[in-house]
Amino acid sequence: MTTESTDGIATIVQGEDRTLTLWATDEKGNPFSLTGNTEIVVKLPGTTSAIERKKTDGQVTVVSADAGKFQCTLTAANTAAMKSGSKQSFQAEVTFASGKRIIVFDSVLTVKKAPV
């Protein structure tokens, strides 16, 4: 399932497969170009350590480099290991030949426990 949130909050249920569609923006809210990136690592809150998904491992895909749009695929095992809670933050580290940029997605993730 792909998540494209209209309210800015992505909701994930632990133990389900998910694909998050994300847009990187600069400080002014303009699209942050992903053109020329060599790696994108998405780091999500886990119960014991961060859940990392990488472009070079095929877990992150650039959809539109100019628009800053990319997707992060999460397996059921990934979401089961995520920390439950509301309005959590996570980040994406985008690496270019010239250096690394960290994009923070602040208070936009809710992870719920699966109903019994």
Identify the residue ranges that each predicted region occupies.
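Contiguous segments within soluble domain cores/interaction surfaces
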Residues: 1-116
